[in-house]
C-alpha cells in the first residue's frame, strides 16, 4: 500500500512537472528566437533589406546565412593579412606569426623596462626602440611577400631573420649584437622562443 502511494505521488509529480518543464523550455527557446530576430532585423536593416515578418524557421535560416557570411569575411580578412595563405594550411606561417607576436611582446617589455629604470639615456632608449621597430618591420615583410601557393620554407640565410646584419650591429653603442653562428641555423631541432 505504501509503495502504491509513493508510486502515485511520483507519478503525480511527474504528471505536473513534465508540462511545466516543457513550458519553461519552450519559453527559453522563444526568448532566444526573439533575441535572434531582433539582432537579425537590425543586421539586415543595416544591409539595406526591409523585413516585415519572420517566422521561427526564417529566423534560424537567416541566422545561419549571416553566420556563414561572417565566417567567409573573417577567412577573407585572414587570407589578405597572410598573403593568401591560410594560417591553418601552413603551420610554418603560424609559427612565424607566433614569433612576431612574441617579438612585439618582448619589445613592449623592453620599452616598459627602459621607462621604469632611472638613469637610462633617452638617446639609448630611442636608438634601441627604433632598432627593434626596424627589425619588426623586417619580420613583417619576410612572410607576406611570398607568392600565393608557394610553401613557406626556411631561407638559405636563416641568421638574417634571427640577428641583424653586422652593419646594423656596429651602429649600436652596446656592441652586444653579434651574428649567429651558421651551425645554429642548420640544426634540425626546434628554434628556442622566449614564450
Swiss-Prot record:
Residues 13-70 form the bHLH domain. One of its GO terms (cellular component) is nucleus. A motif (WRPW motif) lies at residues 192-195. It is found in: Nucleus. It comes from the Eukaryota. Residues 163-195 are annotated as: Disordered. SMART domains: HLH, ORANGE. Gene3D superfamilies: Helix-loop-helix DNA-binding domain. GO terms for molecular function: DNA-binding transcription factor activity; DNA-binding transcription repressor activity, RNA polymerase II-specific; protein dimerization activity; RNA polymerase II cis-regulatory region sequence-specific DNA binding; sequence-specific DNA binding; sequence-specific double-stranded DNA binding. One of its GO terms (biological process) is chaeta development. Keywords: Developmental protein, Differentiation, DNA-binding, Neurogenesis, Notch signaling pathway, Nucleus, Transcription, Transcription regulation. Pfam families: Hairy_orange, HLH. The keyword Signal does not apply. PANTHER family: BASIC HELIX-LOOP-HELIX TRANSCRIPTION FACTOR, HES-RELATED. Has a particular type of basic domain (presence of a helix-interrupting proline) that binds to the N-box (CACNAG), rather than the canonical E-box (CANNTG). The C-terminal WRPW motif is a transcriptional repression domain necessary for the interaction with Groucho, a transcriptional corepressor recruited to specific target DNA by Hairy-related proteins. Transcription repression requires formation of a complex with a corepressor protein (Groucho). Transcriptional repressor of genes that require a bHLH protein for their transcription. May serve as a transcriptional regulator of the Achaete-scute complex (AS-C) genes. Contributes to the neural-epidermal lineage decision during early neurogenesis. Part of the Notch signaling pathway. This is Enhancer of split mbeta protein.
Amino acid at each position: 500500500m505504501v509503495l502504491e502511494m509513493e508510486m502515485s505521488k511520483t507519478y503525480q509529480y511527474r504528471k505536473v512537472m513534465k508540462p511545466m518543464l516543457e513550458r519553461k523550455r519552450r519559453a527559453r527557446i522563444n526568448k532566444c528566437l526573439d533575441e535572434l530576430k531582433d539582432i537579425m532585423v537590425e543586421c539586415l536593416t543595416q544591409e539595406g533589406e526591409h523585413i516585415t515578418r519572420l517566422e521561427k524557421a526564417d529566423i534560424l535560416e537567416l541566422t545561419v546565412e549571416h553566420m556563414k557570411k561572417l565566417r567567409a569575411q573573417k577567412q577573407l580578412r585572414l587570407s589578405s593579412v597572410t598573403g593568401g595563405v591560410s594560417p591553418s594550411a601552413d603551420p610554418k606561417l603560424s609559427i612565424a606569426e607566433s614569433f612576431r607576436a612574441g617579438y612585439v611582446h618582448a619589445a613592449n617589455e623592453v620599452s616598459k623596462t627602459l621607462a621604469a629604470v632611472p638613469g637610462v639615456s633617452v638617446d639609448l632608449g630611442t636608438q634601441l626602440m627604433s632598432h627593434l621597430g626596424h627589425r619588426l618591420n623586417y619580420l613583417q615583410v619576410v612572410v607576406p611577400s611570398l607568392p600565393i601557393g608557394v610553401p613557406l620554407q626556411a631561407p638559405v640565410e636563416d641568421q638574417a631573420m634571427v640577428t641583424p646584419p653586422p652593419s646594423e650591429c656596429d651602429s649600436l653603442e652596446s656592441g652586444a649584437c653579434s651574428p649567429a653562428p651558421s651551425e645554429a641555423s642548420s640544426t634540425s631541432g626546434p628554434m628556442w622562443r622566449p614564450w
